[in-house]
């Protein structure tokens, strides 16, 4: 019950900043329009709407990292967390309390992307539902990564690292903008060692109904999600002991 009340408080805090929320939900749609326009004039298989949309949904989750990191960093700087550390809330309660309101926003963003892509020529099938469900592990990873960053960094640092660096890394390492095989070498090895490209390939496979291929990419995402969530809980636990 305490965790649910904390989650409700976090929801209200997120809704107090509708501009950032609108930007996070709307920017992936702008990219869909822009890249679809490029595809219409200079056909590139990577930018075909059925291939592009699943990748854009994965890229859009980078904004969930920024949301969660900013929320935690603001709470730390306002000393709210220091007061909450004196309550019976555990470190796990804090992490789940922050995650619960952001996860529906992430799934809403994904659904909006797919619905927005339909008039652009996206193939409509039940696989869209599978793709939305299948992105949950990656959404949890992104949110947990934001919570970890927010527990270690200040608001200004979060804006630079999560808002610029991680957003660009997510784009480059997911293979949304270019085929990783064209670069190859160390860059491709690094990309394959991280969850971003696996999430993009998972989404493409689920959307295409290729569940065997999707199964090949789910494990790295689950492992990264569990590891980052555990790291975030550990950071909160350490801060609670300090205060």
Where are these regions (language model features)?
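Short cytosolic juxtamembrane segments of multi-pass membrane proteins
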Residues: 236-243
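Short helix-loop-helix connector
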Residues: 85, 89, 120, 153-154, ...
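A short amphipathic helical element positioned immediately N-terminal to and/or at the very start
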Residues: 3-15, 203
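Membrane-interfacial helix-loop-helix junctions in multi-pass membrane proteins
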Residues: 42-46, 123, 174-228
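Transmembrane alpha-helix boundary and packing residues in multipass membrane permease domains
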Residues: 32, 36-37, 114, 118, ...
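Hydrophobic alpha-helical transmembrane segments of multi-pass membrane transport/permease proteins
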Residues: 13-41, 49-69, 106-109, 168-171, ...
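Alpha-helical transmembrane segments and their short interhelical loops
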Residues: 91, 95-168, 210, 214-222, ...
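Hydrophobic alpha-helical transmembrane segments of multi-pass membrane transport proteins
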Residues: 30, 34, 49-119, 165
């Amino acid at each position: 019950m305490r965790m649910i009340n904390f989650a409700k408080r976090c929801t209200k805090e997120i809704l107090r900043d509708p501009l950032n929320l609108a930007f996070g939900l709307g920017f992936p749609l702008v990219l869909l329009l822009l890249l679809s326009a490029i595809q219409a004039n200079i056909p590139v298989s990577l930018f075909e709407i059925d291939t592009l949309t699943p990748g854009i949904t994965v890229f859009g989750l980078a904004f969930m990292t920024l949301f969660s990191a900013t929320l935690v960093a603001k709470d730390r700087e306002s000393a709210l967390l220091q007061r909450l550390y004196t309550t019976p809330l555990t470190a796990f309660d804090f992490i789940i309390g922050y995650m619960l309101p952001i996860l529906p926003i992430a799934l809403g963003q994904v659904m909006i992307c797919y619905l927005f892509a339909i008039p652009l020529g996206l193939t409509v099938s039940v696989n869209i539902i599978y793709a939305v469900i299948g992105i949950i592990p990656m959404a949890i990873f992104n949110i947990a990564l934001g919570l970890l960053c927010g527990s270690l960094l200040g608001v200004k640092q979060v804006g630079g690292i999560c808002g610029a660096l991680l957003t660009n890394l997510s784009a480059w390492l997911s293979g949304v903008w270019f085929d990783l095989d064209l670069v190859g070498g160390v860059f491709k090895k690094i990309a394959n060692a991280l969850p971003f490209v696996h999430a993009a390939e998972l989404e493409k496979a689920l959307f295409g109904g290729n569940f065997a291929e999707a199964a090949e990419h789910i494990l790295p995402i689950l492992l990264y999600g569990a590891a980052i969530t555990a790291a975030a809980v550990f950071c909160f636990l350490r801060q609670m002991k300090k205060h």
